[in-house]
A protein has these predicted regions:
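A generic structural signal for ordered secondary structure
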Residues: 10, 21-26, 55-59
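A short, exposed loop/beta-hairpin motif centered on an aromatic-Gly-Thr core
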Residues: 16-33
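Alpha-helical and His/Cys-centered functional microenvironments
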Residues: 13, 34, 42
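Short aromatic-glycine-(Arg/Gly/Cys) micro-motifs in beta-strand/loop hairpins
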Residues: 1-21, 49
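Generic hydrophobic secondary-structure signal
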Residues: 5, 30-33, 44
């Protein structure tokens, strides 16, 4: 079985969505390591306001999915 990691990101400066090319791995451990690295990259990218990162298999099973977004400022009235 093959494992794939993909990230969908929203660039707040360009108001555009980007999807990374799925990266393929032979083991679930390799995919999980890449998943956490990608999520870390997304979280440190100042031009993004949200991203969704996921691991899925070649038979369509989703192993992990994580959504990250920039915290919204609190409005105090």
């Amino acid at each position: 079985m093959r494992y794939y990691v993909v990230s969908v990101q929203h660039n707040k400066d360009k108001d555009a969505e980007n999807r990374s090319v799925p990266k393929a791995f032979d083991t679930e451990l390799q995919a999980k390591q890449a998943f956490h690295a990608q999520l870390g990259d997304d979280m440190s990218n100042a031009t993004l306001d949200w991203s969704v990162c996921m691991i899925f298999t070649d038979i369509g099973s989703v192993i992990a999915s994580e959504r990250w977004e920039v915290p919204k400022p609190e409005i105090v009235i």
